[in-house]
């Protein structure tokens, strides 16, 4: 095992960002550091603070098309510190990997974006169009005051993004083997099934909501929602939480609470899913309350300049072809896509994200910056 320093500019900036313990929704000066670098190469910096969330909109140029790097400075909590090989906010290089919370998700991407942009502007100071950065500290949290609020601000003044490249860790086994050219929609239900509480020895005086709901839940879990399509897998429904009872063995509960989530394709809409679930509840004659939370619409970036440029960049820098996919969770791309922007996600290998000993290969950081730079050249030269 070797511990070494590294002079790669992307690695050095990543280390500076990791050293700022920006657990969501904190930013801890990460955006200030980025803003200083961007201002030095001609970006107009516009901080946007909404309640406890720090956001930044930075732009170089006044004309279209607008290429936007999007990402987040916040990270998830470090968790059990005793399980980390190194302190999570003390960036450490071991055997060619940089360890620290946020190394892969997504401070490495942020550093690569900055360095790629600096190199591009140095070579092309009079580039056509505009380059922008949309950065938030509210991606890992409730995503209320982050990207969605910035987009609302931009939309209100008719400022449009043409292409957005989100730095989420899209890669699986090696850098660039997968890019995300879309995401499924996400819809969450919070269901309360009502009964009558009572003593288990006197069931005729009570009404057990667990017993009543069981056939519904069985049918819900076995329902086929759609077949998916060439871009999206079939819609998936997963029960995430069930809670009922007082903890005592002799009490029939009065209510049952169930939370379930849909990750849905473009073959259905949220409205169709809601209609089908509520029809199922009615068919089972349940007394219930239900609330729905829209977490994001599905989106897809098909063939076109952004996907072409990204494919070209990955092939040029890595020597292999990428695989566009729509699998996985949601990202802030879901807030950008409804504006009409084309959105892709390209970032490091995601094997250690949200885990103890999160790390990124330092050679991947430099390659990622080169990919980003080639994408800029393909779109704005």
Curated annotation (Swiss-Prot):
Pfam families: M20_dimer, Peptidase_M20. This is Succinyl-diaminopimelate desuccinylase. Binds 2 Zn(2+) or Co(2+) ions per subunit. Belongs to the peptidase M20A family. DapE subfamily. GO terms for molecular function: acetylornithine deacetylase activity; cobalt ion binding; succinyl-diaminopimelate desuccinylase activity; zinc ion binding. It comes from Shewanella sp. (strain MR-7). The active site is at residues 74, 139. Pathway: Amino-acid biosynthesis; L-lysine biosynthesis via DAP pathway; LL-2,6-diaminopimelate from (S)-tetrahydrodipicolinate (succinylase route): step 3/3. Signal peptide: none annotated. PANTHER family: ACETYLORNITHINE DEACETYLASE, N-ACETYL-L-CITRULLINE DEACETYLASE. Coiled coil: none annotated. The gene is dapE. Homodimer.
